[in-house]
Design a protein with these regions (language model features):
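Conserved pre-ATP/AMP-binding loop-to-beta segment of ANL
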Residues: 2, 17-18, 134, 139-140, ...
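Conserved AMP-binding/adenylate-forming core of the ANL superfamily
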Residues: 2, 18-63, 67-71, 88-93, ...
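Hydrophobic alpha-helical segments in the ANL/AMP-binding
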Residues: 9-11, 42, 46, 64-83, ...
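AMP-dependent adenylate-forming
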Residues: 7-30, 134-141
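Conserved AMP-binding A3 loop
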Residues: 30-33, 175-184
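Conserved G/P- and acidic residue-centered "switch" motifs that form tight phosphate/ATP-binding loops
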Residues: 56, 77, 183
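Structural core segment of the AMP-binding/adenylate-forming
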Residues: 47-48, 78-151
Length: 184
């Protein structure tokens, strides 16, 4: 029997909800917390119109939000497109366009790069990209395409949401679209 990534987390969260799932500089996350956050993010993204098969680009350094967003995509049946946050603007633009990502999840700034400004510049060149989700503290009220990660988690908590991945075929669908630098 083939099991989806979303189902693996959900099963483990049911069996061992208080057991450590992830240890990071930000602290400890349990299986129950990870599953709950992934479900909330999936519900919020689904509320924005993200569906099974849509591409979700992740431009994040190693952090808990990367893991939660990955599992949220799995719960949606979406395709994860992990991208190196160190990519220069032109390469990032190409990969986002080529992947046809409808959502990008990133940090507000990383290693001196202002991703909010970068995406403001990129939006006109990326017709498929509908939303940007940012991990950080800045108030983003000025653009209805940009959402704070924490706000989406809050808005998705407790939503009645039937996960696409629970419908049975998700384990056999494409889950990730991986780009390389071309070197080995």
């Amino acid at each position: 029997m083939t099991v989806s990534l979303a189902a693996v987390l959900a099963q483990r969260a049911t069996r061992d909800p208080e057991r450590a799932f992830l240890l990071s500089q930000q602290g400890r996350m349990t299986f129950g917390e990870a599953d709950s956050q992934a479900e909330a993010l999936a519900a919020a993204l689904h509320g924005l119109g993200v569906e099974a098969g849509d591409r979700i680009a992740l431009l994040l350094p190693p952090c808990p939000e990367f893991v939660v967003a990955t599992f949220a995509a799995a719960k949606l049946g979406a395709v994860v497109v992990p991208l190196n946050p160190r990519l220069p603007g032109p390469e990032l633009r190409y990969l986002l366009r080529h992947s046809e990502a409808v959502v990008a999840v990133t940090v507000e700034t990383f290693e001196g790069v202002d991703y909010l400004q970068l995406f403001e510049d990129l939006f006109p060149h990326l017709p498929e990209l509908q939303y940007l989700v940012t991990v950080g503290e800045e108030d983003l009220w000025y653009d209805d395409r940009i959402f704070q990660y924490e706000d989406l988690l809050s808005s998705g908590q407790g939503r009645d949401y039937a996960a696409a991945a629970a419908e049975g075929d998700a384990a056999d669908e494409v889950f990730g679209l991986l780009y390389t630098s071309g070197t080995t």
